[in-house]
Amino acid sequence: MAEIYQNHVIDPTYFYDCIEEFSFNYTIYVVEKKEIDASGNVKRTYSKNAIRGSLQSQGVELRQSKDGNTKEMRYNFYCKSLYRIDIGDIIEYKNRYLRVESVKDFDEYGVRECSLLMVQLTKYRDLADYIKYLQGAKLV
């Protein structure tokens, strides 16, 4: 006789109302494609989209090194499972650019979670050029 498993099934939209209660609109830059140029540098192509979710601060950490001290700002982002977020995507918040470092698949309640780290645009020239283009400061 086949064994019967007692898995519970919950509607994946169960927490959508709760998420919506604490959500705001954010700009997200999604990595469309990656290429390697002749010099061996990775060149990314971004597209600008909107995402709705809840951004929670995880605090600031001081990183000390011989090259100089820096502060790292970390955030967690929660949104509906409908959104597809991947490592490398960047969310804009108060003129800060937060790079997705890790993504957790949505849970049985339909919540998707990812961890973010604030980055400097000087380290992401492709994105910096794209943002200047969107603002009209740079022509293609």
Predicted segments with their positions:
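Short, conserved turn/kink motifs that form compact alpha/beta structural patches or helix kinks used as
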Residues: A2-V9, F22-T27, V31-V140
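Intrinsically disordered, non-coiled, low-complexity regulatory regions enriched in serine, threonine
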Residues: P12-F15
